[in-house]
Amino acid sequence: MTISTQILPLVKEPERLENRLAEIPPEPGVYFMRDNSDRIIYIGKSRKLRSRVRSYFRDGYNKTERIATMVKLVTEIEFIVTDTEAEALALEANLIKQHQPYFNVLLKDDKKYPYLCITWSEDYPRIFITRKRQLGKEKDKFYGPYTDAGLLREIVRICKRIFPQRQRPQPLFKDRPCLNYDLGRCPGVCQKLTSPEEYRKIVQKIAMVFQGRTQELIDILTQQMNAAAENLNFESAARIRDQISGLKSLTADQKVSLPDDTVSRDAIALAANEEHACIQLFQIRAGQLVGRLAFVADAHAELGAILQRALEEHYQTADSVEIPLEILVQHDLPDSDILADVLTQRKGKKVTILTPLRQTKAELIEMVERNAQYELQRMQKFGDRNHQAMQDLAAILDLPDVPHRIEGYDISHIQGSNAVASQVVFIDGLPAKQHYRHYKIKNPTVTAGHSDDFASLAEVIQRRFRKYAEDPQLSRLGNPDWPDLIMIDGGKGQLSSVTAVLQEMNLLEDLRVVSLAKQREEIFLPGESKPSSTDAEQPGVQLLRRLRDEAHRFAVSFHRQQRSDKLKRSRLDEIPGLGHHRQKQLLGHFRSVDYIRQATTPQLAEVPGIGPRLAQEIYDYFHPA
């Protein structure tokens, strides 16, 4: 007889529950709740750990349906004691980001909303728009996410026009500045014609724009302009005057009707349906609306908790000047006093969080809520179209359910040379680029002058699913990496090669595979000699076409990259004594073979690993007598 060692939920073991609760101290800190798989399913904070955790298990405690479900799954409770509530708040935010517990309010990484990044980690910081906040370094600063990408681009364009700044991630030339320097758009950072300290002063002015301190910056520049004019430096005064004019154009028509125009405040509200919550945060400084930020969260929580999570995320990396004196919220926050205390300590002035009930401030919250509602409607309309496409595809292919994860594969080469493959992934009908993969084809029969798409596709599919074939015990159901559908770019031949290799791996019964031919958008199914009878304009077919086109684009871009790298290496391969490592050193230093050819012997010898003798051989190769 097998004895189960599965741990029961604490609610089913009252004695163990009471003992565990008694061990929790009445101090500030963070608590973890785990299920019987030892996964952290919830993380919370409290100024009194014991009373907060005990409240979850108290009869009559007002719990949401989601939290009530969570409590029934808890098998273990852990905690970390902190010195202050502020430390607990910061620790909780970091741990939620790290573990992504299922029952916590989680802000979605919605790449629709862009950020403005300033790379303070570099001596000469860059300023650019990005949707990939997670790639930034510790000292880099992100502002956003912004609801209006067009407006953000316009602000960046104006800032580039009025403040000379670094324009390129890498220098265009090794020994001279580019045209942007001659036009006054860049102070020549590539040749270090300005010091890092002076350049950072320029960037700090731009940062003030995104901190909502435009009027403060205008006042500073006005003083500098007047001082320059008094010193008869009229050229400098005229330049500053133009900067002030450009900044004033940013603040035109941005007035918000409030009785006072001196208090800095943020106003946050949301609109939610059964699945998603769209959150909008308006930043108001000196009576001006200087920023509209947007967040998306799961809606399976109390509305106040969702708002608090968004505020904690937003203010986690905020500077003291970016924290407002007043925060208006649509719903009461569960821990507004803790959040207010933390923000007060960081700002050095009292920060107030309140839910306005009347007059102008309540009207402001209503305006923010209306904007959140419009965004939710737009998201829902797009989501409905997407879901309709997945339902249509499920009907066309007779799938048991709508396909959550779809993978698309394509091959790219030129007559067999540099053959590569792409794997792209759509999750719920949208590209999930973090799951994209590319493959270099290793099949010895695929060489220059001899292509074999059938063998190439078979190789890629075999490599993709090899671990499942080698380990039959490896779970497939519920595995987020297991596709509900595979689409091959091609016709019957390509599909047959893929189904054959899946049959050999004993995986064909567990995977649905189709191919999509280019000419008539025809869908081929395994074992069928003729394509399915479908209309190319059906939503499901259009979804497959988007997947096919994305797989083709990704494969072609990787093929071009491989071909370009090979062309670069092939010329350097002809130089005796210049191995692969030294080639990388040269290309990393000079950026291209053309710049290597233009370099002098002493310049070549400066590269690590390239001595005077090899430098002379490289120079002689490009400059034969």
Curated annotation (Swiss-Prot):
The keyword Thylakoid does not apply. Its main location: cytoplasm. It comes from the Bacteria. Keywords: Cytoplasm, DNA damage, DNA excision, DNA repair, Excision nuclease, SOS response. Residues 215-250 form the UVR domain. GO terms for cellular component: cytoplasm; excinuclease repair complex. Residues 26-105 form the GIY-YIG domain. One of its GO terms (biological process) is nucleotide-excision repair. One of its GO terms (molecular function) is excinuclease ABC activity. It holds the Pfam family UVR. InterPro entries: DisA/LigA_HHH, GIY-YIG_endonuc, GIY-YIG_endonuc_sf, GIY-YIG_UvrC_Cho, Hlx-hairpin-Hlx_DNA-bd_motif, RuvA_2-like, UVR_dom, UVR_dom_sf. It is found in: Cytoplasm. Interacts with UvrB in an incision complex. The UvrABC repair system catalyzes the recognition and processing of DNA lesions. UvrC both incises the 5' and 3' sides of the lesion. The N-terminal half is responsible for the 3' incision and the C-terminal half is responsible for the 5' incision. Belongs to the UvrC family. This is UvrABC system protein C. The gene is uvrC.
